[in-house]
């Protein structure tokens, strides 16, 4: 274990090979950690390095940046692969006014705080590059928008930490709820080795019921620190949250074998706490993982940092996917396992288990059902989602592994085929009779699940091999044929039943099932496997490189499908020709019915095509008209007005109309007034003329008062020559004016005596 140092100025001189240089003259310094020792804290070591511009503290165990504020000229700071725990430590870099480049990758703060990058960009305004990525202007705006509501208050960091903790707690609660849903639905977790394409299902019931597994011999005490023997990324992350932050050797990137592949589930394994870790055969002999895991096929499943369960899944060169029955506890795991993989013992001697493997101590299960077991094909059919591209990809990878590892040796394959054919020919009714409704009632249960017994491993093998087909369609097709057979030929009483091989042999005579004999298929299988291995060697580029390689997946799928649906050959002689004839007749009737429906469909499609073409023509004409109208409007300079503009203009015109209406009313009143004035003027003129005429008619010696007494003047005023009483009634002003004029005339006339 590397030593942990608290840095001081003397340590800086020793590590940086500074002998006679003054601290003020140092501009660049590299203090990377090594296996000899790692820096734990910096303290006041940089108090005198005022002109330091570049500092490299990568690959250390620094947990606090207290004391970094003395580097007032620092521009480039590398804290790669340290143990900076929180944003509070990142905020200690704020007093550095010239900091332009910062590297905090592989620190806990990067994994735990989702807003870490935004916080760093918001806090360090002069930052130009963060974690070897240029800080974009959009990130600055996003950070400012995200943290603007907190402002520059004193509780800024507390509020940021609080929001981060709330997000973490929310994720934990979501993880617990999802874990409970998984256990309630009795769904299996699937972990896949990216090197092998191996599916390993974990039934939740067995995981929940199992208490613990004894520790392997020779690996020390159970309370040994997890940092010495890492069990995988997820185990270390769980342990990091629960153990003190100064235990830094347990980091997921430290002491990690380059040949060890750690596989993550498509879902977030952080919430569930399950992890599968595989170790390659070529790992270093001095690595501690080899002492803990002596066999390459042991995986560790962890739900807690202190609890692990080891399951032996057999030799990696011959293992194929297998699922424990949902009702079988882990106490019967060895028996089920030995029954399923019993054929491996006949093909080649399986290496004995290491003494490090201990027996399981688990609670007994009261409802054990050992009469049925699920094959890999059933498992993949039930667990993989056909609508998901990821599920199809993983299923293809699993089938690839099963085919390459089980059929990789042509000589072994020939031996297996011969044994299978012999076992099918020698199959007798001693296995027991099965009612017809046992198969017809449940088509999803394959026929092989009704014939499993501890002494018939070959029989299980033929059906297990058939279930390993990479095409779920082909698998269901064969099972449906088995279920639709006339079961009276295969399941009768022990006295009059025929061998099952005759029923299976009749399958080759059915329409669409042209599987050649085993002796004819063997060279084809060997050729396909050889081509598949060459394809793997061609495209292999490290762990998991084949899972998303389309150049590999396409040809591999075609090769595997050629095993399931081989080239048609001459059909075998069937033992039941009447069944074959019935099948052909049914097929012929179906084809005739389909042929009758085809013309009707063609007519309807033609009619639809005609309607679509007509609609297309109409729409094209409308588009042409619209284009012409738009061109004309552009040429004439007319600009289309929007609805808002038209509404605004309408309001303006309405106001103008109202104003004009008011002005019109005023003009009408003015016209009435002018008409009244004109009438008054005419009355005055007439009255004046009449009075002048009267004055001219009167004798000179006659008195004016006698000539025009008030009564007479009043009478004259009432009897106008025009028949209007203008002086007396309609115009008082004119009446007074007339009197004034008459009086003036009388005054101006000379007296007769004078």
UniProtKB/Swiss-Prot annotation:
InterPro entries: CEP72-like, Leu-rich_rpt, LRR_dom_sf
Source organism superkingdom: Eukaryota
Keywords: Coiled coil, Leucine-rich repeat, Repeat
Annotated coiled-coil segments of the chain: 600-680
Keyword flag Protease: no
LRR repeat coordinates: 51-72, 73-94
Region (Disordered): 241-270, 702-734
PROSITE patterns: LRR
UniProt entry tagged with the keyword Nucleus: no
Compositionally biased spans, kind Polar residues: 722-732
Basic and acidic residues composition bias: residue spans: 241-255
Domain LRRCT: 107-146
Protein name, UniProt field: Leucine-rich repeat-containing protein 36
Organism: Homo sapiens (Human)
The encoding gene: LRRC36
